[in-house]
Structure formats: structure tokens, C-alpha cells
């Protein structure tokens, strides 16, 4: 089996926040790293989502042409994701030629199958701005929940998909003007109504989907699918290859999911790999998507309808890992509202691994979760710095001071070591099971339990006391503990990869040893006497109360 993994495409309109990271890219990366470690063939694809009104609005605010703005943002985002250790096999752009080509191709296939129709619609025209206002160019009050900053394409508060004309008290996002009038314009529609039965049949077969994902898909289907407009009166986007529509582009939610395929094509072209084997005639491919819940309607309904309507054997997703929202002191993390902590800011505060661990430990899997600075402090200090970092520091420093920079000889493992081995084996298998099942909070809890096991062992065995009476027994305890460090490095690798590399280097592991699976690493006798090691710098810096108070004041955490 080969594993295709995609995470929801981060939008180009600004640096993403912690909620974006934990709701798609981070869990996808952890899953990809774990599967690679297990020896599986993995392809992890992502790209920036660059079309639509938010990109144009952000470019206007930045005083740049939209193409220049998107190019700069792409490189900024790509660099930040690299610093966070996101291991994309390819990170592309929906503005790339491959995506233009494939988007137009899918449209033409749908048109051939009579799933596209022209319609004349009424849409807002801003008299003061002298232009049509599609999607997010209109802001107003949501008719469903009353949220006053709802956008013309979707309410970010209740996730309802909207049209601009549904908004109460609509206004131009550009100028704030309420001098709007309805004018007619011809557009192209995807006949979701004609594809409804096929989509429902496909959704009904997805028995492994989570309650969150399945319920959102069924809610849409039960409300009845309506034809969806897939063109916009914009300049920036994929041009519509139809006479009479030369001044229109495709709706961002039509071309964006095609970006998964087009980015794979770009990867294949660059690396001389067969990209089509991942997307066509791909019975041996298991495809998993990662995204937050506001993206689920498009990925469970509109994108599958596009594939089904093409009447071609494109790969359909096998499992969608949907996430709820990460909230920040009473409100959802939001790029458009600039609420919360953004990824560039986060890296100035703490290391990438601190954030990776804390976020995935609190991933909003079954319900919304809340970020607090106190929780961040607790998990960095107690779980990372104490349970892992302090264990490594105590063992390697003690070994260096008493035995030198090689593992000492002597002693034979006894009942305590046998019991420790059984416990570690059980925890490693639980960890692997949870990662296979995409249960990230449980996986992180199990990893922390594995770290605690080592601390409990040395508290009982107390090598610094034992050394005074039995140096051979102490040597055996030390070797066991250093093998625990090796196990911690490998089992932690999907979660905190930068720390893992520091541990690999400290233990001077060979290339083969660094590629061990968690199961292979469970043997607590593998590193034998005579092996060299180094004492690394402290792995984690603790966060004190003064810094927490400062961060709460700076980022509105009250």
C-alpha cells in the first residue's frame, strides 16, 4: 500500500496562525513522518491557495499587484513551514501553470458530460467602487447566526456557505460603501443537483469517517444540493476557456482542490516520477486528507462531485481527518481578524518543537479546544523540559562524569529491566496504533507516558546512589537508560523532529539506527558497552511566569 497525504491548502492572504497549523498541516506531517518511519511509501502534497477575493483584497492592502503579493507570500509561507519541520514532498502553488491546465481540463470534462450550465444571475455592483463584488468583496450580517462580519462566501462563525445576496446589511469590503445595487451577469454553474445521488452513494460508503466529517456531509446532502456558481468577475485566477467568458475566472473553490493533483504533477515533472500513478489507476493508494471543519463541505461534496462528474478514474479520498477549531481566549484564531498568535510570531517566542508538541497534544479532534499561555507553559515545562529533557540531561551528564564518554561495561539486566521492557513494548504498540488511527491526542498522551516510564525507572534504580556500592550494576542501569533515550528519540521523531536530530547526534547513531522503526527501537539492550556519546545542550528552555504575563499582555490573552 502507498500513502497519499494532503493537507488543506493554506490561503495566501497572510501568514497563518497556530489554528491553521494544528488543523491541517501539523497532523498531516506527523502522520507522514510516522508512515515513512514504518517503511511505507508516502507522498505528502500541499500548496498555497492563491486565487479568489481574499488574495486581491490583501494585495490592495499591501499596495502590491496581486501576482507580486502572492509570490512574496508563497516564499514567506514556505520558509516558515520549513522552520516548523513540515516535511512536504512538494509544496506548490495554485497559480502555477499546472493548476491552470488541469482546472480548465476538469471544467471541459464536466461540460462534455452536461454538468455545466450558463445562467444569468444578479450580483452586487458597488457604485462607489465601480465594480462587481463577488464573494469576500461583500461583508455583512449572517442570516443564520447574526455574526456581523460574515463574508459573502461563508460565515466563519457558523461555517454556513453563503452568497453575497443572502447577507443582511451588505457593504463593500474594499471601501465600506453600502451604495450597492444588483446587476445581472452571466456565469457558469456546476450542476450539483444532477450529481447529488452519486455523491450521496459515495458518502454512504465511507463507513470509517469520523462523526464530524460524516455529519457535515450528510447535512449538506439532506438539505438538498443546488447548482453552484463556479465563475467570478475577477482578473486574478484561472481563466475560463469559453467564448463570452474571457473576462471571468473560476471560483477559488473550484480550482483549489485541483491543486492537490496539479502540485503532484509539478512534483512528478521536477523529480522525474510518475505522478499519475498516485491519482489514476491507483487501487494500491490510500488517500488521507487533513483539514478544519469549515473546509469539510467543499471536500466532502463539491470536490467529489467534480471528480465523479468528470467520468474519469481519478483517485477519491479514502479518509478525511476533520478538526474542530482552536480557540484563543473566547474567539476562534482568525487570519482575517488578526486574532491569536501567528506562525512567524510563534517562532520568535519558542522553538518549533515546543509548538508542535503543545499543539498536537491539544488538537481539537472531538470538540473545539482552547489555547492558553498557562497550558503552553505547563506542557513545555513539565512534559518536554522535565519528562524528556531532564531525563536525557541527568543520564548523559552522570554517565560522562562517572564513566567517561562511552557506555560502561558490567552488570546484567534483572527483573526491573524486564518489567521496564514489557512496559515500553506495550506503550510503543499503543503509540503506533493511535498514529495509524489518527488519534493524535491519545498518541501524544502515550508518548508522554513513555517518557514518564523512564523517570520512574531511574527514581527507583537511583544510579547516583547505586554507584557508591555497585558500579557494575550502575553500568547496566546506565546502558538501559541510554537505550531509553534512543527509544525516545525514535518514538518522538514524528512529533518533535528537531529534538530527535539532536538526540541522534548525541548518541552518535548510525544511519541505519536512525531509520529504525519504533518497534525495532524498543530493544533496551541494543546500544552496548563501548558506544560513544556526547552530552547535548539543554533540549528545552522553560517558560517562567514573567514571560507568560508578558505574552498575555502582548497577544491579548486575557
Swiss-Prot record:
Main localization of the protein described in the UniProt heading: cytoplasm
CC cofactor: Zn(2+)
Substrates-to-products reaction catalysed: tRNA(Met) + L-methionine + ATP = L-methionyl-tRNA(Met) + AMP + diphosphate
Keyword Cell inner membrane (UniProt): no
Family matches, as Pfam families: Anticodon_3, tRNA-synt_1g
Disulfide bond residue pairs: none
Entry GO CC: aminoacyl-tRNA synthetase multienzyme complex; cytosol
UniProt similarity note: Belongs to the class-I aminoacyl-tRNA synthetase family. MetG type 1 subfamily.
Protein name as catalogued: Methionine--tRNA ligase 1
Organism whose genome encodes this protein: Acaryochloris marina (strain MBIC 11017)
Amino acid at each position: 500500500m502507498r500513502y497519499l497525504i494532503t493537507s488543506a491548502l493554506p490561503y495566501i492572504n497572510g501568514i497563518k496562525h497556530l489554528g491553521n497549523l494544528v488543523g491541517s498541516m501539523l497532523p498531516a506531517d506527523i502522520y507522514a513522518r510516522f508512515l515513512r518511519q514504518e517503511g511505507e511509501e508516502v507522498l505528502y502534497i500541499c500548496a498555497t491557495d492563491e486565487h479568489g477575493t481574499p488574495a486581491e483584497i490583501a494585495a490592495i492592502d499591501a499596495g502590491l499587484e496581486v501576482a507580486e503579493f502572492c509570490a512574496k507570500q508563497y516564499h514567506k509561507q514556505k520558509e516558515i513551514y520549513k522552520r516548523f519541520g513540515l516535511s512536504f514532498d512538494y509544496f506548490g502553488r495554485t497559480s502555477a501553470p499546472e493548476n491552470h491546465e488541469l482546472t480548465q481540463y476538469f471544467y471541459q470534462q464536466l461540460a462534455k458530460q452536461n454538468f455545466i450550465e450558463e445562467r444569468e444571475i444578479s450580483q452586487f455592483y458597488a457604485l462607489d467602487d465601480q465594480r462587481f463584488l463577488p464573494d469576500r468583496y461583500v461583508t455583512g450580517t449572517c442570516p443564520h447566526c447574526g455574526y456581523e462580519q460574515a463574508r459573502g462566501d461563508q460565515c466563519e462563525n457558523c461555517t454556513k456557505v453563503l452568497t453575497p445576496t443572502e447577507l443582511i446589511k451588505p457593504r463593500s469590503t474594499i471601501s465600506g460603501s453600502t451604495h450597492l445595487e444588483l446587476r445581472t451577469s452571466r456565469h457558469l454553474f456546476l450542476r450539483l443537483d444532477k450529481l447529488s445521488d452519486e455523491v450521496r452513494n459515495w458518502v454512504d460508503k465511507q463507513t470509517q469517517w469520523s462523526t464530524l466529517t460524516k455529519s457535515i456531509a450528510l447535512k449538506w446532502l439532506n438539505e438538498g444540493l443546488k447548482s453552484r456558481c463556479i465563475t467570478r468577475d475577477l482578473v486574478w485566477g484561472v481563466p475560463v476557456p469559453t467564448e463570452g467568458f474571457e473576462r471571468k475566472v473560476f471560483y477559488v473553490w473550484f480550482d483549489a482542490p485541483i491543486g492537490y493533483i496539479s502540485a503532484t504533477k509539478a512534483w512528478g515533472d521536477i523529480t522525474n516520477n510518475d505522478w499519475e500513478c498516485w491519482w489514476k489507476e491507483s487501487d494500491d493508494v490510500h488517500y488521507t486528507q487533513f483539514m478544519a471543519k469549515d473546509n469539510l463541505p467543499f471536500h466532502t461534496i463539491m470536490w467529489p462531485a467534480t471528480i465523479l462528474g468528470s467520468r474519469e478514474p481519478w483517485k477519491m479520498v479514502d479518509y478525511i481527518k476533520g478538526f474542530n477549531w482552536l480557540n484563543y481566549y473566547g474567539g476562534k484564531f482568525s487570519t482575517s481578524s488578526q486574532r491569536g498568535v501567528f506562525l512567524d510570531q510563534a517562532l520568535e517566542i519558542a522553538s518549533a518543537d515546543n509548538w508542535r508538541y503543545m499543539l498536537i497534544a491539544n488538537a481539537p479532534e472531538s470538540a473545539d479546544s482552547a489555547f492558553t499561555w498557562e497550558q503552553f507553559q505547563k506542557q513545555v515545562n513539565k512534559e518536554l523540559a522535565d519528562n524528556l529533557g531532564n531525563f536525557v540531561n541527568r543520564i548523559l551528564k552522570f554517565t560522562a562524569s562517572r564513566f567517561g564518554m562511552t557506555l560502561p561495561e558490567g552488570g546484567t539486566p534483572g527483573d526491573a529491566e524486564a518489567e521496564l521492557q514489557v512496559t515500553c513494548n506495550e506503550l510503543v504498540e499503543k503509540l503506533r496504533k493511535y498514529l495509524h488511527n489518527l488519534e493524535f491526542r491519545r498518541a501524544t498522551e502515550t508518548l508522554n507516558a513513555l517518557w514518564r516510564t523512564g523517570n520512574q525507572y531511574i527514581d527507583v534504580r537511583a544510579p547516583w546512589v547505586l554507584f557508591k556500592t555497585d558500579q557494575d550494576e550502575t553500568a547496566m542501569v546506565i546502558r538501559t537508560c541510554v537505550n531509553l533515550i534512543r527509544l525516545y528519540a525514535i518514538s518522538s521523531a514524528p512529533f518533535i523532529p528537531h529534538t530527535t536530530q539532536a538526540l541522534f547526534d548525541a548518541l552518535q547513531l548510525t544511519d541505519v539506527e536512525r531509520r529504525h522503526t519504533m518497534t525495532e527501537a524498543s530493544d533496551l539492550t541494543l546500544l552496548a558497552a563501548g558506544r560513544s556519546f556526547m552530552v547535548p545542550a539543554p533540549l528545552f528552555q522553560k517558560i517562567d511566569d514573567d514571560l507568560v504575563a508578558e505574552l498575555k499582555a502582548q497577544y491579548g490573552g486575557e
